[in-house]
């Protein structure tokens, strides 16, 4: 057993506090140095986030950096002297929405010229000149690997100096930053474990906006989870563009692992080892992870999920298309048959595992047979839920350079409707299978439709709504399921649960 001891004393602004890590690895106890944050906030900042869970996690890192520089995070943009939008580039619709919000915020700026507006995240590289120089609708542009430079960029903007940093890093993971949970329910939290991606799917901008794949030091991951546990959090989601390819060998890009020393290779930590470590270190904490790429998910990970109750029985496993021809054009490095084999393995080892998906319909040259292949794969798996989109060509991606976007919008919409309708049918089938069963639910928040009811999730990531009674947010409750919709289970609370 290793004991965490924190020595406290009165700190001056220039001093630092040293936190000893309770996790010992390879015979050494690591330490994280955190700057003391001021107890007096002199400025206010507003952060608005779009897109994937990673963006929302990044916004919590940004909030921490700003807090260390005397900014209070506010939920009201009209109260802020600094307005930041953490942006998403995955679809054109998201970019259009962000542009609209920038115009809204510039109306605020007309009444107060001291307000500074910044764009963060995946849009930064592509729009830096357009938004900053041509349209002049932002003052600051910051890429995903440059958030530590924000205080410097803010000062530049105040002095009318170009404030841009979109440089991608080979080693930045923000492992030394303690995130501020600005959008949290104080029960569930995101914990980033990897950044970037090496897969180069032809439809995706992530490798160009977030850089090459690198993994975070497991010591800093354990430290962050330890802090969450002490604050009363009950659930965490391990985040990465591709969590299953997590690989720690002392730091550096995953692609450089072949050049590592024999000792580094021997002591390296893969995702299954990290998952086991976290499950054993925090047995009372629910653990989720997202997202998995089918080509990288191993049998070892599935077995670890099977062995530990606190690892949630849900896998988000995007397949994008059921057609081998389209998968190849997408540069997805698995076949339909290999994907089905993986599904069979999951069902065999974890029969009650919830499985969700991502699907892109209308990819260049997709024909009716390709579409039918997608529908037939859905019929085979019968997913619990999924995220379904029509293909949106993104500038700078390999697909935009190699393929003509030649599937009409009408056909895309029709195919998407068919996919959504089929998924709703399958979701209802999965939901009805819970009726009559008593299942453990983590209470998260009020139901959207009634303040007299709680909303929470099962281990399969299924939403459950039930009467509040004497239970509270953060409780694990056994709920007997009475009815359902295609998206929600409805039940009666029985008692506090002995499970998680």
Predicted regions and their residues:
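Active-site proximal loops enriched in glycine and acidic residues that flank catalytic Cys/His/Asp
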Residues: 240, 291-293, 319-321, 357-361, ...
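Conserved, mostly hydrophobic/aromatic
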Residues: 201, 221, 238, 289, ...
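Proteins enriched for Cys/Gly/acidic motifs involved in redox and nucleic-acid/cofactor modification
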Residues: 4-246, 270, 337-348, 372, ...
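Terminal RNA-binding accessory module
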Residues: 5-19, 34, 399-500
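Glycine-centered loop/turn positions within well-structured domains
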Residues: 148, 199, 244, 295, ...
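Conserved SAM/AdoMet-binding glycine-rich loop
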Residues: 117-121, 126, 230-368, 379
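Short flexible coil/turn linkers enriched for glycine and charged/polar residues
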Residues: 183-187, 197-199, 311, 321, ...
